[in-house]
């Protein structure tokens, strides 16, 4: 079994009356996990180099895709925080099969929800900065960061399951977003 390192870039989202998060991009370092995850669950995984380093209280983390460091965190641990109780996370993913013709879909799109219980083990406050850089097809820098409210370094474990939701997704409305998931 190979171990994958994954980063999730999540945006607050709502579907119907369900509050959750939309995973805009999921950089991963294990190429063989990309296609099966997309095809089975709709996970927006993209190959990237992920790095995390801690030297004493100084931490750095980065996500590099196609030679561009698109996400970078630089900071210092300033103290321990109370370890939160386990908490639920709901993520929205879209699963689809692009059409052979190049126009529209042969199947889907479908809404898949990830129901996850995060179980924090440690939690520390980090003071630092977040840098987002532009890369076509990975639009993290297109999102305005008005203020960094805080950063935490948390070690967690989790339990999760996926649900294929019984809802209709308008294929014409979703088609314009397909390029982002595959580039």
What positions do the PLM features span?
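Aromatic- and glycine-enriched beta-alpha-beta binding-site module
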Residues: 1-78
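Interaction-surface and assembly-scaffold signal
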Residues: 47-183
């Amino acid at each position: 079994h190979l171990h994958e390192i994954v980063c999730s870039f999540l945006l607050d989202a709502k579907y119907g009356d369900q509050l959750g998060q939309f995973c805009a991009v999921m950089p991963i370092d294990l190429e063989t996990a990309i296609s099966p995850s997309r095809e089975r669950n709709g996970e927006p995984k993209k190959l990237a180099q992920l790095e995390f380093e801690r030297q004493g209280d100084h931490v750095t983390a980065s996500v590099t895709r196609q030679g561009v460091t698109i996400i970078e965190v630089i900071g210092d641990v300033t103290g321990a925080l109370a370890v939160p109780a386990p908490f639920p996370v709901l993520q929205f993913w879209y699963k689809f099969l692009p059409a052979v013709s190049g126009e529209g879909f042969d199947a889907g799109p479908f809404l898949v929800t990830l129901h996850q219980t995060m179980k924090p083990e440690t939690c520390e406050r980090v003071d630092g900065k977040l840098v987002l850089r532009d890369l076509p097809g990975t639009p993290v820098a297109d999102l305005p960061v008005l203020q960094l409210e805080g950063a935490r370094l948390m070690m967690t474990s989790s339990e999760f399951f996926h649900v294929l939701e019984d809802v209709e997704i308008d294929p014409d409305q979703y088609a314009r977003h397909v390029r982002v998931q595959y580039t």
